Amino acid sequence: MAPRGFSCLLLSTSEIDLPVKRRT
């Protein structure tokens, strides 16, 4: 139901947050 922009943003954040958490 969320807009495409939100879905894309969420996916991008998840992809960036994953490596960051792995590094820490």
Curated annotation (Swiss-Prot):
Subcellular location: Secreted; Cytoplasm
GO biological process, one term: negative regulation of execution phase of apoptosis
Tissue specificity field: Highly expressed in the kidney, heart muscle and testis.
Domain of life: Eukaryota
Pfam families in UniProt: Humanin
Induction comment from the UniProt entry of this chain: Down-regulated 6 hours following staurosporine (STS) treatment and up-regulated 24 hours following STS treatment. Down-regulated 6 hours following beta-carotene treatment.
Gene Ontology cellular component annotations, sorted alphabetically: cytoplasm; extracellular region
Record key words, sorted: Cytoplasm, Secreted
GO molecular function: receptor antagonist activity
Residues that span the membrane, as ranges: none
PANTHER family reported in the protein's UniProt record: HUMANIN-LIKE 1-RELATED, HUMANIN-LIKE 4
Role description: Plays a role as a neuroprotective and antiapoptotic factor.
The family this protein is said to belong to: Belongs to the humanin family.
Name the UniProt record assigns to this protein: Humanin-like 1
Biological source species: Homo sapiens (Human)
Gene assigned in the entry: MTRNR2L1
